[in-house]
Amino acid sequence: MDFAQVKDYLVNLQNNIVAGLEQADGGSFRRDSWDRPEGGGGTSCVIEEGNVLERGGVNFSHVHGKGLPASATAARPELAGRAFEAAGVSLVLHPRNPYAPTVHMNVRFFAAIKEGAEPVWWFGGGMDLTPYYGFEEDAIHFHQICKHALQPSGSEYYPRFKKWCDEYFYLKHRKEPRGIGGVFFDDLNQPDFVTCFNLTKSVGDQFLAAYVPILQKRCNLPYGERERDFQAYRRGRYVEFNLVWDRGTLFGLQSGGRTESILMSLPPIVKWRYDWSPAAGSPEAKLYTDFLIGKDWLPLD
């Protein structure tokens, strides 16, 4: 296990992604470095009211502490009470144009440390796409890049991590997926550190290729108040998932993370309506019937 190597990679990844997004948007991200009193810190890069991105954040954090929070030990009670060190890059981008999808990507490394014992470590991460008005070619492109990112590690990873993503980004209280998925993994520590690190790096390194072509294709499509209204309504689902179900958000808040950085994933304009559903056959209804269905977007090998 080489924590310094992982940290160096993550810092460079954040810089590379921000540079790519600034080129795509034409605007600049604000860089905000911060320290965590309990140990560690990070850098948040945020854009608001950009040319294409209404709000977006690319966050790097490296935190450590004496005791793991409850969200980190829920599945592994044997780690309770261990010291921890965690580092990751997490991003969420909310474009202004309703035809351009929201996207989330995260790669992270975690170590639970106890004196006199081997550290327990694992990687996690993934990326997923949340359209408001779906395009099949965009879903296929996104999943193709996800599959391509995992292919060098073995052909078994994409179907496994795709299924995991569909199951994780699911709003149980709404009984609907958050979006059209992608890939998601956690607790990855087999077969060895180098293999797991290489897989995680490949996911991070392929993010721009997965998302920027979709953003560029959709960001200039004409739209009106109707589309913005539906976008704001569907963004409400994003807020619900992040605040109710997301393990990363819960870990950040429970471990004394920086609230501004943790909640930068939330969209700037959101609406809720009581017991609303789109008219049958409308473009808005198509999102539910054709896209939020846990579909296999690529042919199964």
From Swiss-Prot:
Pathway: Porphyrin-containing compound metabolism; protoporphyrin-IX biosynthesis; protoporphyrinogen-IX from coproporphyrinogen-III (O2 route): step 1/1. It is found in: Cytoplasm. The active site is at H104 (proton donor). The record marks H173 as: Important for dimerization. One of its GO terms (molecular function) is coproporphyrinogen oxidase activity. The keyword Cytoplasm applies. Residues 238-273 are annotated as: Important for dimerization. Its EC number is 1.3.3.3. Keywords: Cytoplasm, Heme biosynthesis, Metal-binding, Oxidoreductase, Porphyrin biosynthesis. GO terms for biological process: protoporphyrinogen IX biosynthetic process. Substrate binds at S90, N106, V107, R108, G256, G257, R258. The keyword Cytoplasm applies. It is an enzyme of class 1 (oxidoreductase). A divalent metal cation binds at H94, H104, H143, H173. Its cofactor is a divalent metal cation. It catalyses: coproporphyrinogen III + O2 + 2 H(+) = protoporphyrinogen IX + 2 CO2 + 2 H2O. Gene3D superfamilies: Coproporphyrinogen III oxidase, aerobic. SUPFAM superfamilies: Coproporphyrinogen III oxidase (SSF102886). Pfam families: Coprogen_oxidas. Belongs to the aerobic coproporphyrinogen-III oxidase family. NCBIfam families: PRK05330.1 (NF003727). Homodimer. Involved in the heme biosynthesis. Catalyzes the aerobic oxidative decarboxylation of propionate groups of rings A and B of coproporphyrinogen-III to yield the vinyl groups in protoporphyrinogen-IX. This is Oxygen-dependent coproporphyrinogen-III oxidase. It comes from Nitrosomonas eutropha (strain DSM 101675 / C91 / Nm57).
